[in-house]
Design a protein with these regions (language model features):
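A generic structural signal for residues embedded in beta-strands
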Residues: 18, 66, 107-109
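A generic structural signal for short beta-strands and their flanking turns/coil linkers
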Residues: 18-20, 28, 38, 82-91, ...
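Hydrophobic beta-strand-centered segment that forms part of the acyl-chain substrate-binding groove
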Residues: 52-56, 69-108
Length: 149
């Protein structure tokens, strides 16, 4: 593990990669609404949502946040062979721009910190969810991950 830790520490401050584009369909939004019991009209009622400044339905902020996990796994990161990785939490989560239905998003990941903890390592990563064709990101968060060996 020490070799992996040193290799990752050398990458601190670097962007590690970008995920593929993910389409945010109304079906995905509706499924998230069902799973979380969050049926606010701006997410699930296209007719009412069309009358808002958004001009249509938008993804839940927490859907965008939830998708950051599988998107991050698309970005190659050589962490050796941990027994498991766990979500340790988040810091400074913001949703600067809404994600309109049928738009595409992707994740950009930067490694901010790496440190040793008992049995493993702790990483702090900045994750930025971009919306295709827009400058303002959908989400910016500091993601905390623990790997145990």
């Amino acid at each position: 593990m020490q070799e992996v830790l040193e290799r990752l520490q050398a990458q601190v401050g670097q962007e590690l990669g970008v995920s593929k584009w993910w389409e945010i369909t109304q079906e995905r939004i509706n499924a998230f609404a069902e799973a979380t019991d969050d049926h606010q009209f701006i997410h699930v009622d296209p007719d009412l949502a069309a009358q808002t400044p958004f001009g249509g339905t938008i993804a839940h902020g927490f859907l965008t946040l939830s998708l950051s996990v599988p998107m991050a796994t698309e970005i190659p990161l050589d962490v050796g062979n941990p027994l498991m990785g766990v979500n340790y939490g988040l810091d400074k989560v913001r949703f600067p721009a809404p994600v309109p239905v049928n738009s595409r998003i992707r994740l950009r990941l930067t490694l901010d910190e790496v440190s040793e903890v008992p049995g493993g390592m702790h990483m702090k990563q900045t994750v930025v969810t971009e919306i295709e064709g827009q400058e303002k990101p959908a989400m910016v968060a500091e993601r905390l991950v623990r790997l145990y060996y």
